[in-house]
Amino acid sequence: MKVIDSISTLRQTVNAWRRNGESVGFVPTMGNLHDGHLKLVKKAKAHNDNVVVSIFVNPMQFGANEDLDAYPRTIEEDKAKLISVGADAVFLPSVAEMYPAGLDAQTFVEVPGISDSHCGASRPGHFRGVATVVTKLFNMVQPDDAFFGEKDFQQLQVIRALARDLSMAVTIHGVPTEREASGLAMSSRNGYLSKEEKATASAIYEEMQRVKAGIEGGNIDFSELEDAMVTNLEAKGFKKDYCQVVNASTFKAATANDKELVLLVAMFMGKTRLIDNLQITR
């Protein structure tokens, strides 16, 4: 596996593959890799001759009071995991390599509409940071295919929109959420949880399944289902950020006429913010 820290070397590597007629898959990450990330790499390997994985903790997508400094960095462990699943190159740029003029002078990319609600409302500027860094990485790697987890469903839709709207020649693949045996969605931030908190956190998935069963059983009082879920989780010590059944395309509150829905959830367990979602077809 090639270990690359400069944009110029990354481009040389990809261009050499291209000259050989080989395809390129891409998996952007912030590191601290778990089985969910490795599943993305395996999917990319199944689709492409070569796979690039980036590890970059992107300061542009963190707010002033968020966990940029505390975010776990486990580069050596990450490299070993990537070798084990057959990644061909890992791109490890510095902040200076990615933003040579500094964050304040950086041109940015913003996806209107779907960036504004839910995680976008809770974390102002977050999706602007995501859209900007992903656009830069796509321009560097020029992948045929890029792979993202469905756990960050809103992020996935933002990236699909920017690729479509900016006429990018990349196919975006969403990969189903990888879960622990308890149902808890795998996340790098799960490492912040104590053993007891982690056991309790599995209740999010249990409650989401209850909402899904209610909707599939014909209940269209979405507010009632949401409120019951929040009440049950708050009784277990969670604090609500948001919990809403939305139209899967617009992210607006679901109506009785909508068929493709997604339940979007963000809850705090202590200081740790946990997000999850469940797609539902009526």
From Swiss-Prot:
Pfam families: Pantoate_ligase (PF02569)
Main location, first listed in the record: cytoplasm
EC number from the UniProt entry: 6.3.2.1
GO-annotated cellular components: cytosol
Cysteine pairings via disulfide bonds: none
Keyword flag Cytoplasm: yes
Binding site for ATP: 30-37, 149-152, 186-189
Coiled-coil regions listed in the entry: none
Active-site residue list: H37
Gene3D superfamilies: HUPs, Pantoate-beta-alanine ligase, C-terminal domain
GO molecular function: ATP binding; pantoate-beta-alanine ligase activity
Binding site for beta-alanine: Q61
UniProt subcellular location: Cytoplasm
Metabolic or biological pathway: Cofactor biosynthesis; (R)-pantothenate biosynthesis; (R)-pantothenate from (R)-pantoate and beta-alanine: step 1/1
One annotated GO biological process: pantothenate biosynthetic process
Binding site residues for (R)-pantoate: Q61, Q155
Other observations noted: The reaction proceeds by a bi uni uni bi ping pong mechanism.
Subunit structure of this chain's protein: Homodimer.
HAMAP family found in the cross-reference section: PanC
Family: Belongs to the pantothenate synthetase family.
Protein known as: Pantothenate synthetase
Species per Swiss-Prot/TrEMBL record: Alteromonas mediterranea (strain DSM 17117 / CIP 110805 / LMG 28347 / Deep ecotype)
